[in-house]
Regions:
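N-terminal acidic, glycine/proline-rich low-complexity segments
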Residues: 1-123
Length: 123
């Protein structure tokens, strides 16, 4: 992380744990959808209200940017190569950042769910 040329935005555990998605995807009528099928299987075995959205929130920020969904805290993460431990240092000029929730979880979940329900157009 020290030598990465651009900004790194960390999306922590707390970001995706309460943003539940997949319920609407699992109920779609589309056939042969690996995403729909995976959610149907996992929701029946886990939480029927949805799955935690750690990956989806990271992808949302990577594609659309962090605003208006989140705020960021600037700083620098230092990683000890020997122990694997890390330390965050607040720094308004830092090239690292971590996400802080800005919008309510259900609103972010609805936005992500809408993207996940998108079907490709036939050409």
């Amino acid at each position: 992380v020290e030598t990465w040329p651009g900004r790194i935005i960390f999306s922590g555990f707390e970001i995706g744990k309460d943003i539940l998605t997949g319920k609407e995807v699992a109920q779609m009528s589309v056939k042969n959808s690996p995403i729909k099928d995976a959610y149907q299987m996992s929701l029946s075995q886990d939480n029927p209200e949805g799955r935690n959205s750690w990956d989806q929130t990271a992808v949302l920020v990577a594609i659309k940017g962090y605003k208006p969904y989140f705020k960021i805290k600037l700083g620098t993460i230092q990683i000890n190569d020997t122990t694997g431990t890390n330390q965050w240092i607040d720094d308004t000029a830092g090239k690292h950042a971590y996400l802080i929730k800005e919008m309510p979880e259900p609103e972010i979940a609805a936005i992500i769910e809408n993207y996940m329900k998108h079907q490709p157009l036939k050409k």
